[in-house]
Amino acid sequence: MTTQTNETIAAIATAPGRGGVGIIRVSGPKALPIAQHILGITPKPRYAHYGDFCNANGDILDQGIALYFPNPHSFTGEDVLELQGHGGPVILDMLLDAVVQAGARLARPGEFSERAFLNDKLDLAQAEAIADLIEASSQQAAKQALNSLKGEFSNKIHELVEQLIHLRMYVESAIDFPEEEIDFLSDGIVEGKLNDVIDQTDAVLAQAQQGALLRDGMKVVIAGRPNAGKSSLLNALAEKDIAIVTNIAGTTRDVLREHIHIDGMPLHIIDTAGLRDSPDHVEQIGIERAWGEIESADRILLLIDTTDNSQLDVNVHWPEFTSNAAYAKKLTVIYNKIDESGFSTTNHTSDAPYQTLPLSAKTGAGLDTLKAHLKSVMGFQSTTEGGFSARRRHIHAIEQAQNYLLTGREQLQLHTAGELLAEDLRAAQNHLSEITGAFTPDDLLGKIFSSFCIGK
């Protein structure tokens, strides 16, 4: 997919603000002439030159180190120049302006990584891993992003694609040469190979889901009546006072958010307004927002005040959750304030699809059990070695591929339908290839790279 462009791009590659070092990155056919203008010399490839950085008038703007990498041995696959000077925003802006005056244009967000992808220096999953590594919120997330950058995720996808290609060869041979004595479609060979691919796809999907959880985190919404202890639970999970806690009902009127980690698993904890009928217009707005957060939650923690015996029957008082299958499957009922009530869930067992936990947000009793529960319901394993970062689009692509594989197996088992199986295998291969960019619409590429930092 190697591409050539006549445009040379430039950007500040270091983070905004002041720092000890600031870097200007340049990529394209004019990188060497720009280096000659700025440095006053012709730099040796892959050699650190220390000297003055000057503008077109010969004015010294800064002093620092210049590195020149001729194509194709560079990050982008093009001629690349890096100017490493002092990290002041004024200095960097002046130097960037001099680079632009010498023939470059300002880069779009993610354009350096996009050129690296187009020049086959890395695939799409690796390019996305660069952004994931920068944005990692924990050590484990950073390690898995680095694994993806090194190609571990891509290699697994390539292996699946290669197996699908060989499987398609078997199937299409049986279709094209039906007179042959060996019928690959009915002798079990194709079905056996297909089952192997399905099993391996399941394994990759499980790893991708773990990687996406580390990258994106789990959205946990705390819901319940006013004064059920929602804000106290937020503070307990965050281990600091985020929300105001009082005995006055309706203290929390808006959504409060806090980002925390449990053994490396990122969580977005959201405290919401107490759910009730209220004549107060402002409180009504907060309650509407609460339901909006509940709708998009990965997990709902419904708090029940155990000091009020009239509220203990969840099915009676919260049919909005228990009778709604979409809510019930992601619902955990928290019986709070057990330090005051002496409540025990052993007296309130049921066959409900949701889990119940006793807890005291005030004293912390049951908090460790809740944390372990959250890790369990999301399938998080804090001791997992290796692994790779993944995004929701990757999971969707693998799920789509798996659906086609399962449909193809059904066609094979019921009808020995070679043509239909071949089409399902082709579709599965295309979905998997979207992950690495081997088969990707241009509009998706634009969307992915536009979310990157400028200079990356």
From Swiss-Prot:
Keyword Transmembrane helix assigned: no
Cofactor binding, note field: Binds 1 potassium ion per subunit.
Positions contributing to K(+) binding: N227, T246, I248, T251
Binding site for GTP: 227-232, 246-252, 271-274
EC number(s) recorded for this UniProt protein: 3.6.-.-
Record-annotated TrmE-type G domain positions: 217-379
Main location group: cytoplasm
Gene Ontology MF annotations: GTP binding; GTPase activity; metal ion binding
Amino acids binding Mg(2+): S231, T252
Swiss-Prot/TrEMBL cofactor(s): K(+)
GO cellular component labels: cytosol
Residues annotated for (6S)-5-formyl-5,6,7,8-tetrahydrofolate binding in this entry: R25, E82, K121, K456
Keyword Hydrolase attributed: yes
Subcellular location: Cytoplasm
General function of this protein: Exhibits a very high intrinsic GTPase hydrolysis rate. Involved in the addition of a carboxymethylaminomethyl (cmnm) group at the wobble position (U34) of certain tRNAs, forming tRNA-cmnm(5)s(2)U34.
Subunit structure: Homodimer. Heterotetramer of two MnmE and two MnmG subunits.
PANTHER family named among the record's database cross-references: TRNA MODIFICATION GTPASE GTPBP3, TRNA MODIFICATION GTPASE GTPBP3, MITOCHONDRIAL
Name of the protein in question: tRNA modification GTPase MnmE
Organism the protein comes from: Saccharophagus degradans (strain 2-40 / ATCC 43961 / DSM 17024)
